[in-house]
Amino acid sequence: DDVSDFESVMQWLADKQPAKEVAIRLIHNDFRFDNVVLDPQDPMKVIGVLDWEMATLGDPMMDLGSSLAYWVQADDDPFMQGSRRQPTNAPGMLTRQEVIDYYGQKTGWSVANFDFYEVYGLFRLMGIVQQIYKRFKEGNARNPVFATFGPFAHYLGQRCEQIMARSSL
């Protein structure tokens, strides 16, 4: 009740959804930094991917958008820094834009209009955060950090709105 429904974000996603010619592939559907095993000799090389229980067929860039929703970089504001659960803001780590560019380079796919996928990833995370916050408010999740998930959901919605406002889509 104290977390917005973000209807404007849902409508924007519906209106801006990429054309149907998207390449459908097997996607992990929970692809994020803490679900990969990196080569200790070459940290740009993934040698394992964990937790495949949510895998499905879909647009592979949705995996990237979802992954980057969790990606906190060094120049993010204090609120986002406080949400960090992965070492993505450590010195030498790629920024979100550098990850997007690297992905485009490695796949050969255009990442020019990535705003849709970035908003999608943030919106997806917002839904997860709202669900956990609701369980916390009802007494079904007790971790005190979950008390911050209501404000965090609002923050994610504001980030969506900022991306939507500057987007050329």
Tell where the protein language model's regions lie, with residue ranges.
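An alpha-helical support segment within catalytic cores of ATP-dependent transferases
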Residues: 1-29, 39-45, 104-108
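Short beta-strand segments
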Residues: 26-32, 48-50, 118, 124-127
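Catalytic activation segment of kinase domains across protein kinase-like and atypical kinase folds
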Residues: 37-79
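Active-site activation/catalytic loop segments of kinase-like enzymes and analogous catalytic loops
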Residues: 62-107, 121-138
